[in-house]
Amino acid sequence: GTTYSVRIRAVNVAGSGAQSNLVSVTPRTVPATPTVSSVTPGDSTATVTFTAGSDGGSTVTNYEYTLDNGVTWLSTGAVASPLTISALTNGTSYSVRIRAVNIAGNGAQSGATSVTPYGLPGAPTISSVTGGIAQVSVALTAGTTGGSTITNYEYSVDNGSTWTTRTPAAVTSPMTISGLANGTRYDIRIKAVNAAGSGPASTSVSSTTKNSPAAPTIVS
């Protein structure tokens, strides 16, 4: 990385000849290994945060990554941290390594870091809603996980205008929604929740709660 000004001259038994013209030269080598501090999963992506090593005396022009322990290397186009790896499959574990590239060639690869990308869960399917007294019972089937375990559901009783988190958290079916008014129609929708957040809502299914039985009359 240091620039030197070089001249040469020939020597024989008679002595030293005239020196050559001045030529500048900067020695260089491949860049040093980057240090990966984190690999953060996203929706079909992974974001790699790293600290660059020495550039070897020549500007780093690219960072490359491998997902197969160095068999195949792909360009990111990035020249600084962070870099984003895309087109991954949610729910699949990847072993990520990176290396720096300059005009001298490819540097040594970093250590491996595992990451599993994930996105929002798919919409659940409501198979039935049964009205009861001040409550409804919702039978549902989970959609896709998005690559991350479904941890809870949210529900709406007004066709998606407002949403309530299921408490306590549960992923079992059926789901009981209580605290409703008797003899009232409700338009039920459900969302699944995972580490990425709340997914899209199910289609709406309507149900009417039952009325409480009338008080009996004692005639004698």
Residue ranges and their predicted role:
Residues 62-65, 152-155:
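Short beta-strand elements bearing conserved aromatic residues within extracellular beta-rich modules
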Residues 14-58, 90, 104-148, 182, ...:
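Pro/Thr/Ser/Gly-rich low-complexity, intrinsically disordered linker/stalk tracts
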Residues 81-83, 173-175:
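Short strand-edge motifs at loop-to-beta-strand transitions and within beta-strands
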Residues 73-79, 164-171:
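Short beta-strand segments within Ig-like beta-sandwich modules, predominantly Fibronectin type-III
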Residues 10, 41, 52-53, 67, ...:
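Hydrophobic beta-strand positions in extracellular immunoglobulin-like domains
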